[in-house]
Amino acid sequence: MGLHEAKDIESRFTRYVEGLVSVIGHADRAVPLHDYCLGLVMPGERKSVEPMAAITAPGRTAAQHQSLLHFVGQGGWSDDDVLGKVREMVLPAIERYGPIEAWIIDDTSFPKQGRHSVGVSHQYCGQLGKQANCQVAVTLSITNHDASLPVAYRLYLPKAWAEDDARRCKAKVPEDIAFKTKPEIALDQIRWAHEIGLPGRMVLLDAGYGHDSKLRAGITELGLAYVAGILPQTLVWKPSVRPGRTPKKGRRDAPNTTSVKDLALSLRARAWRTIEWREGTNEWLSSRFARVRVHVASSHERPGKPSKEWLLIEWPEGEDAPTKYWLSTLPSNITFRDLIDAAKLRWRIERDYEELKQEVGLGHYEGRGWRGFHHHGTMCIAAYGFLISERETIPPSGPRSAALLPQLAVPDSYRPRGSPLAA
């Protein structure tokens, strides 16, 4: 990259940060906001406060450390206002490649040691693929096939935390934050997105959220369609049976229902088709799929006969059984390929999480409080938004941040806390 191009990028970064400054209130927050965002987009293995202070202010690292620490951990600015401004500035860059096609609900986890970081608990940690001590944040992202951006970010507070007044007080959890399940947090985010009129009329969920029939019903009540991953044991009415009433205890007459796995195994060979799809600019992928119109056997449907929806099944060649199942309320006349394309669009959120963690340090926050956790997440999303808006200047290989801004020197005297050489 030439000097002229680098200067242009620095100018656009400055204008971008000025947009964020316009919604944070006090003028004295402008410099730490700029420096925090700069630290996040600069190359570096660790994006916690201390190393970012050393990178952004080599001559006054200690003072910069205190400034950034106060800004992210105690600053009284609004996460909602900043995320709203990020959305306003970045959405045109995303829509340049096409309209917003969907909202994606998911969560991301952060392994932690100890028990004092807000919301930390022994729970399923997606990053590690097992039960572990971690924090979990629920997110809603807007997406098309070319780009995506998280627009809502909320820490899941386990029930043990929500009911522990001492830990709540120490982590400064707001009084109005009560225990909610992750699907309940997700539905709150979807209702918020619907109320403010975010573009997009389809919600994508993996099985961790899609299995929740209350969440699916809530999406339908908003007039939105969904493509929701579900579990193999999910019950549907047998195609040959007319759906009946839901018993008071929410149980179905077993002979009249079947699991989606058993239904998939009963399908004839002609029901399966090999179909290709793409994830971004990657090579074409292919697998075997079948789709069936079904009535879901759920106790959370509206009164009366449940509506039909699509059951989409993936059964790759060589596998002993189907590997993925989705329910979808997309129109009955949608093409097979378009239904698969919608289900597979969730790959964008995996890319988001990977880049948010690897490029801008989403998981690097070392504070313990509620405000700092969310402020750091907001700043990471803001930095990521800038990288999205600059995607046309980024070469096809190499880290985004390294391609955008030059490496700043870390002072020779800098030693991370805990280092044997630290004074």
Q: Where do the protein language model's features map onto the residues?
A:
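A short, flexible helix-boundary coil/loop motif
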Residues: M1-R29, L40, L157, D164, ...
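Short amphipathic alpha-helical "interface-anchor" segments enriched in bulky aromatics
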Residues: I105-S109, Y209, N256-T257, K261-L265, ...
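A short, structural micro-pattern
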Residues: A132-C134, T220, K305-S307, E319-D320, ...
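Catalytic-loop motifs flanking and including active-site residues across diverse enzymes
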Residues: V136, R348, D352, H375-I381
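Conserved, well-structured core segments
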Residues: T139, S328, D341, I381-A383
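Charge-patterned, long linear interaction tracts outside catalytic cores
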Residues: V296-I334, W347
